[in-house]
Amino acid sequence: MRTLVVLGDSTSVGIGDPVRGGWRGFGPLLGESFADYRNFSFAGARIGCLRTKQLPSALAARPDAVVVLAGMNDTLRSDFDPSTLHQDLDHVVGALRDIGAAVVTVRFHDHSRVFRLPGTLRRALSDRIAELNAVVDAVVARHGIGCVDLDRLPGAYDLETWSVDRLHPSELGHRRLAAAFAGVLGTPAVSQECVGGVRITPLHHAAWLLVKGVPWLWRRGRDLFPLVVRIMRDARVAEPIRSDRSLPTGLLSDVVEQTAGDR
């Protein structure tokens, strides 16, 4: 295979694996086995962006192999719609297969375990990820493409796999991703030896969570709030009838504690 193309969001951009002048990430690591490597990803991209903004460039490149990694941004938005995601992802993969490209994508891990969200918000995000994975499974089955299950990636839930923000892979995490993609595509193995950057300690993670993590949680939590309310409502309906009809405010307390600092 000669040409590799990467489509996706900030993880595909390489954020979390800094090098002089920018980011590296799994793309260039995997791309070392190809004569030509092109990355059309950009931070904040959703699956719809791949269809409208990245796919045309990918098709023009006539790639032999394509990595498609996006969807997590969709799970964090209030307009999350699995039906639309399926249409967009199916279109992207179908168009790439039509030109003969080998395509590999991912099933997502439960990222709420990495970020350690409070209970009800964790459930909301986990439910969204499960719906996203159902979309991925359907597209993978229809087109017969490769798929890496991030939940089974070695060290998927180890802090060393993640950058200080816990949102993007660290250098080691990107190397693990690249190795998994190489295994599916049948290209040479990717070294797992980290050669740059600063080792991230639990103190780094704690400091980031305090300064930036809580504001991020508040912003994203607002988009997830309708789903949180629905989960609380469903849990309430499932409870045995009690004389005390007060709202289960205790279910919200863990969210409030995590978000109050951003006001």
Regions found by a protein language model. Name each.
Residues G21-G22, F80-Q87, T120-E131, D165-L172:
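Alpha-helix N-cap and loop-to-helix initiation/capping positions
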